[in-house]
Structure formats: C-alpha cells, structure tokens
From Swiss-Prot:
Positions of the catalytic residues: E12 (proton acceptor), D197 (proton donor)
Keywords, comma-separated and alphabetical: Amino-acid biosynthesis, Hydrolase, Methionine biosynthesis
Enzymatic class: hydrolase
CDD domains per UniProt: MTAN (cd09008)
Top-level taxon: Bacteria
Family statement: Belongs to the PNP/UDP phosphorylase family. MtnN subfamily.
Catalytic activity line of the entry: S-adenosyl-L-homocysteine + H2O = S-(5-deoxy-D-ribos-5-yl)-L-homocysteine + adenine; S-methyl-5'-thioadenosine + H2O = 5-(methylsulfanyl)-D-ribose + adenine; 5'-deoxyadenosine + H2O = 5-deoxy-D-ribose + adenine
Name by which UniProt lists this protein: 5'-methylthioadenosine/S-adenosylhomocysteine nucleosidase
Pathway membership, UniProt: Amino-acid biosynthesis; L-methionine biosynthesis via salvage pathway; S-methyl-5-thio-alpha-D-ribose 1-phosphate from S-methyl-5'-thioadenosine (hydrolase route): step 1/2
Binding sites annotated in the UniProt record for substrate: G78, I152, M173, E174
GO cellular component: cytosol
Keyword Hydrolase listed: yes
C-alpha cells in the first residue's frame, strides 16, 4: 500500500519529512512531494501550500504522479466543537466548503454546482484513526470539517459558519478541496488534524503560539496510523 500524506505548511510536514527513509524530492508547480518509506509503509508526502487552490492543485499532482491508494490530510485546524482544546484531534467524517454559495440555484450551503453537498471520508480510515486515538489516549472529535480561503478570526465570520453549519467541529483552509479532488479520483481519504486554536476573536494569537503543538500532535497521529497499516 502507498499512502499519500498532505500538509499545507512547512511546520505541518517537517517532522514527517525528516523521518522518511530513502527520501527523494519531487517539485511540481508550487508544491513539493517527498517519497520514501516511513514506519515500513511507502509514502508520498505533499507540502501543498495554503488555501483551496494550492491544496487542489497539489492533490491532483500527487494523485496523478504518485498514485497513492489512500490519502491522509494532516496539519492544524481551528476548533469549534465545545470539547476541543489545543492539541486535541479532529477526524473528518465529511468535509464541506464554508465559503461556497450557489444556493440561488437550489444547492445546499457549501455545495459546489455538480458536486455532492459534502465529501465523505473513508469509513475504514476513520475507524483506523479512532483506534489510534484510543491507543494514544488522546481527546478527539469526529465530525464535519469546513474549509474556506480565510483564517477565521473574529465573532462575525465565526457566527456565520456556526449558523450555516451547526454541526461543524473544526475549520481550516484546505480539507474540502482535498476531499473534492479525492472524490473525483475515487481515492479514499481522511482528514486528521490537531487543534492549534479554538476559533474566537483572538485566534491569530493562539495559532502562532500553538502551531508547534498541533504539528507534533498531528504527526503523532499519522505515524500511529502508518504503524497500524504496516502491521496489518
């Protein structure tokens, strides 16, 4: 099995990249793909860049050039579920855009024309992530992750997202685009992110302070999932 792993930022991929054995680097457009083996599993690790376009472009190149069997999106997210704190984990059951609106034509909020209302994560990958959560004794929430080309900071945008998507667990800037591309390629995916900030009016302050914690926690989860895959 080959596993595609996607992180947007240098801080979100560096721990994994540095542990890849026989690492080779492929530079495509604005992204970088690092291939090799990690914990006995063949991996292709993409540093996509921030935002939906960069994520979609990078995911397309990753799937086309490396042909992974499954994709794990790692990194940080802003927590909206009431039980989430910095360093906790959010696992996607589905992903949606929070900044897409073609409701005038009968679509649901967040639904792109011609697409499903949400992109569903793979049930087997969700179950694997949840087993790793139990083994690592981490706090986690499984639920909806919403993506958009904005860092959510302030009461008004936060209220809009919660009003439109009352079941939302976390927000970030790439997962829905990654899920969209994986859906088109019929590639199973899951999003496993660590909380870097609890979305509120001071999110930008806590994000800068706690990004390192989130990167360490999300890396811990990805490595646990790879070890579990290697033992199957």
């Amino acid at each position: 099995m080959k596993v595609g792993i996607i992180g947007a930022m240098e801080q979100e991929v560096t721990l994994l990249r540095d542990r890849i054995e026989n690492r080779q680097t492929l530079r495509l457009a604005s992204g970088e793909i690092y291939t090799g083996r990690l914990h006995g599993v063949e991996v292709a690790l993409l540093k996509s860049g921030i935002g939906k376009v960069s994520a979609a472009m990078g995911t397309t190149l990753l799937l086309d050039h490396c042909r992974p069997d499954v994709v794990i999106n790692t990194g940080s997210a802003g927590g909206l579920a009431s039980t989430l704190r910095v360093g906790d984990i959010v696992i996607s059951d589905e992903v949606r855009y929070h900044d897409a609106d073609v409701t005038a034509f009968g679509y649901q909020p967040g639904q792109m024309a011609g697409c499903p209302a949400a992109f569903s994560a793979d049930a087997a990958l969700i179950a694997l992530a949840e087993r790793c959560i139990i083994a690592l004794q981490l706090n986690a929430v499984r639920g909806l992750i919403c993506s958009g080309d904005a860092f959510i900071n302030g009461a008004e945008p936060l209220a809009r997202i919660r009003r439109t998507f009352p079941q939302v667990a976390a927000v970030e800037m790439e997962a829905a685009a990654i899920g969209h591309v994986c859906h088109a390629f019929q590639t199973p995916f899951v999003v496993v992110r660590a909380i870097s900030d609890v979305a509120d009016q001071e999110s930008h302050i806590s994000f800068d302070e706690f990004l390192k914690v989130a990167a360490e926690q999300s890396t811990l989860m990805v490595e646990a999932m790879l070890r579990a895959m290697a033992s199957q």
